[in-house]
From Swiss-Prot:
Compartment(s) of residence: Cell membrane
PTM comment text: Phosphorylated protein may be subject to proteasome degradation. S-acylated at Cys-621, Cys-623, Cys-624, Cys-626, Cys-1022 and Cys-1026. The ratio of acylation by either palmitate or stearate is unknown. S-acylation is essential for plasma membrane localization.
ZnF RING-type span: 37-83
Protein name per UniProt: Cellulose synthase A catalytic subunit 7 [UDP-forming]
Side Extracellular, residues: 253-262, 826-836, 894-922, 976-984
Top-level division of the source organism's lineage: Eukaryota
Tissue expression as described in the entry: Confined to secondary cell wall developing tissues such as xylems and interfascicular regions. Expressed in young plants, stems and flowers, but not in leaves, roots and shoots.
One GO process term, biological-process aspect: rhamnogalacturonan I side chain metabolic process
Disruption of the gene: reported phenotype: Reduced plant size, reduced content of cellulose, collapsed xylem vessels and wilting of inflorescence stems. Enhanced resistance to the pathogens Ralstonia solanacearum and Plectosphaerella cucumerina.
Amino acid sequence: MEASAGLVAGSHNRNELVVIHNHEEPKPLKNLDGQFCEICGDQIGLTVEGDLFVACNECGFPACRPCYEYERREGTQNCPQCKTRYKRLRGSPRVEGDEDEEDIDDIEYEFNIEHEQDKHKHSAEAMLYGKMSYGRGPEDDENGRFPPVIAGGHSGEFPVGGGYGNGEHGLHKRVHPYPSSEAGSEGGWRERMDDWKLQHGNLGPEPDDDPEMGLIDEARQPLSRKVPIASSKINPYRMVIVARLVILAVFLRYRLLNPVHDALGLWLTSVICEIWFAVSWILDQFPKWFPIERETYLDRLSLRYEREGEPNMLAPVDVFVSTVDPLKEPPLVTSNTVLSILAMDYPVEKISCYVSDDGASMLTFESLSETAEFARKWVPFCKKFSIEPRAPEMYFTLKVDYLQDKVHPTFVKERRAMKREYEEFKVRINAQVAKASKVPLEGWIMQDGTPWPGNNTKDHPGMIQVFLGHSGGFDVEGHELPRLVYVSREKRPGFQHHKKAGAMNALVRVAGVLTNAPFMLNLDCDHYVNNSKAVREAMCFLMDPQIGKKVCYVQFPQRFDGIDTNDRYANRNTVFFDINMKGLDGIQGPVYVGTGCVFKRQALYGYEPPKGPKRPKMISCGCCPCFGRRRKNKKFSKNDMNGDVAALGGAEGDKEHLMSEMNFEKTFGQSSIFVTSTLMEEGGVPPSSSPAVLLKEAIHVISCGYEDKTEWGTELGWIYGSITEDILTGFKMHCRGWRSIYCMPKRPAFKGSAPINLSDRLNQVLRWALGSVEIFFSRHSPLWYGYKGGKLKWLERFAYANTTIYPFTSIPLLAYCILPAICLLTDKFIMPPISTFASLFFISLFMSIIVTGILELRWSGVSIEEWWRNEQFWVIGGISAHLFAVVQGLLKILAGIDTNFTVTSKATDDDDFGELYAFKWTTLLIPPTTVLIINIVGVVAGISDAINNGYQSWGPLFGKLFFSFWVIVHLYPFLKGLMGRQNRTPTIVVIWSVLLASIFSLLWVRIDPFVLKTKGPDTSKCGINC
C-alpha cells in the first residue's frame, strides 16, 4: 500500500476513497541447491516432513540418514564434528540410551518394524556414488528437486554452492576412495565407515574447495539453542521444593490435629488460610520446575536469509501501536515509540507500522504527521551511526559517554544538529498539545477546511492515512522509509467495541488487507524499541526451520525506565519476568503479557500448528493386542482447509467451493480479499489487487459491524471477555497446541514507563486482577476449558490457573494480616502451646521457605532486594487492589454492574520522581491503612498487657509480636507512600487514622487490659484484714 495524498475516511456504505498508485510487486525468489553428506557423498535427502535432514542440531554437520543411523547403531553414537550425542530423529529406529521425546512420535519407525532391507540397499547405492565425487550430477536427480531449508516459511531453497546442475558450479569435492568391498554387505559398509573415521582427521581442504563452505556450514546450523540451568543450581532447588512439600503436608496435619479449644474461631480461620496459601504456592511453584534460557545467533540468521547478491528473504513484519487518550498517553511518548520502530535494524521494505487511534483524536493524527516528517532525518541518522536506543527522547537524555565506540569524524557535529532538530520537533508537538487543550465549540477543523471526522469520538467513520512508504517520499539521504499507517476504526452508537482487544483485531484486518506480513509485533504506545535488533532476535525462533513451525509468538520481558532506585512498589516485577517466565519457557512457553510480543499471523487466525506423523492413539478394537485405530481429530487445520479448496472442481466442486467460501465468511467476515489473505501462509498481497480496491476493503474491515456473526474475539485474534485480553489470547493458542518462546537478549528489546505513584500503581494492579477474575468466571477459565485434545500441558495449565486464582488469595491474606492484632487484643493465639518436638515442624517450614527463596535467586540471578520488594508489594496489593477486584468481579457477574477501567497515565513530572511522592487519594488505600493501624494498636495493647501482668506473660507475647511485626514490615513501603515527600501524612489519612484508632481504643477499653486478670476476695465484705 502506498502513501496516500490525504486522509481516507468513511464507512463501508459511504465508499470515501482516494486514488493511490499500484503496489510494488513482490520480488521473485531464486531456487537454491541441496546439500551432500560429508561421509559418503550422497545427497543428504529430506525428512519425513519434507525438510532438509539435519543429523546434528548443535553443529549442523552434513550427514545423510544412512550414515547417521549407522553411527547410532554401530558407532559411538556421537557427531563426528562436535562429539555431541546424536538424538533420535523422526523416521529412525531407537537405539539403547535414547530418551523419550514427545515431538518424535512415529511408532512405525521408532522400533524399526520394517524397511530394514530398503535402508541397506539405499546405503550400498549411496556408497557407489560416494566413491566418485562429493556430489551427484544433474542426471542423478530425475525430478530436479532440492531440499528446502526454510520450512513453512518463504518459498525457495537454501544455496549450498554456486549454481544448480553442473559440476563447475555445484559443490564438487574429491574424497579418498574407500577400500573395495561388496557394496551391498553390512561388513563392507562398516569397513568403509571405519576407514572414513580413521582418515577424517587427515583430510585437509583441497585446492578446489569452495571458499564459501565455512559460511554455508555456519548458515545450516540452528538459529537458536536452549541453555539449560546448570544442574548444580537447579537440582538442589528441586530437592528443596520436594522437601518443602513434605514438610508442608506434615505441618498442616499437625495444625488440623491440634485445635485451640478456647479460640476455635481464630484457629479455624488460620488453618483455612494456611491451606489456601499451600494450594496457591503449589500452583505458583511447580510451573518453575523446568526453567531454561535461550541464545540466538543473529549472524546465522543473516547468512541464511540475507545472502549477498540475492533477494532479502527475511519475513515482513507488521508493527501495531495502540493509543486511546492523548491526554493520558502524551503524543510525544507515542511519537518516540513510532520513531524507534521506523529506525529498527531491519529491511525497510519489510517493516510496516500501524498506529491505532481508538480515541479518533486529531491531536494524535497531527502529531503522527509531524513524526513522519521528522523520521526523514532521524532514521538515516540512527542507521548511519548505529546508535542505541533509537527513541530520540531516551537517546538524548542518556547519562553516558555517547562518544564511546564512535569513530566517524562528523558524528559530534551531526549529533548536535540532530538534537537541535529534535528539540524543535518537541516544541511543535507541545504546541499541538497546548492547542488541543481548548476544544472549539464547532469542533476541530483540518488544514484544508473540512471538519475533522472524529469530532464525536463515539460516532465517527473509519479513517486511514498512509504517511510513509514506497510512494511517501524518501529520507534526507534518498533512501526509502518503512510504511507508516494511521488507523482509527469506525464507531457508532449501539455497537460493542471491546476496547483494546477490538482495536487490535481491527489492526490485524487492516494490515491483512494492505500488507499481510506473516508476523506481527504488538507494542503499547509507551514501549519504545530499546534494541534495534529485537525483531531479528524473534526471527531466530520464528524462521528457524526446526522449531519455527509450532511457535505462535515470541514474548520479550518488559523493562521500564524512570523507576526509583529502590523500586518501592516493585514496578520492575523481575520475579515474574526473570523467574516465572523462564520456568514456563521450559514447558509450553510463556504467557502473553500484552506488549513486546511478535506473533505468527496464522496462529492469531485460529489455525492449529502443522502436524507431523504422530504415534497412533491405541484404541483397542479387540482384534489386535498391540495396535489400534487412530483417533480422528475433528478440529480444522489450515492444511485441511487448503486441501479442501484445492480439491474442488466441476459442478459439484463449484458448489462445495461456494459452501467453503461461505464458511470462511462466517469465520473471518464478509471481505473476500481479507479471506483470501488468511490462506496466504507466507503473507503478501496478490499482485493483481488494485490499490483502490485494497483501500476500500481496508475501510470495510474496520467498520463497526464487520465482526457481527463472525468468530472474531471468540476464536480469532485478540479474545474478548476480559479487560486482560492478553491472557485469554495466549491461553487459546496454547490450547490449540502451539508453543511460545521467551527471548531475553542481553540488551533489553523494549522499554516502557511504569506508574511510580502508589495510587496509580494500585489502580494498575486492580485492572489486572479484575481481568483475572473475569476470566475465572468465564467459559475460558483454565479450570475447565481446553481439556479436549489434551494439547495444553498440565504444568502450563497450573500457571494459567494461577493467573486467574491469585486475586482470591486476598481474602485469606487480609484475614491472616488481621489475626496478629486480634490475638494481641484478646490475649489468645491461633496455636496451642507447642512442645519441643512440635517446634521442629515450624522451624523446618520456615527454613524450607528461606532456602527455597535463596536457591531460586541463585539460578535466576534476581537480587534479594528485588525479591523482597516483590514480597512486600504482594501483601500491599493483595489486601487492597486484589480485594477490590474480587468484589467488583462478583458484582459484575452476579449483579451485572460493570466497571470501566481507566488508562494509566504515562505523563511525567518535571522532577525525576515527582510522581513518586505525589499523594492521590483512592479507596484502595483504605484496607492497608486499616490493617496497619490495627496491628500498631495491637502491638501497643500487647506490650501494655505484658507490663501490667508481669514477666511470666512475656514468653507467649514474643510469638504474637513477631507475627504482628511481620505484617507491619511488609506494609512499610505503603506507609512511606502515605507520608509523601514531606514526611507528613495527608489530612484524609489522618482522619481515617483517628477514626479507626477511636474504634479500636473503645474495643481496648472494653477488653480492659490494665485491670488485673486474677480474682481475689472482695475487700468490702472481709474488711481491712483481708
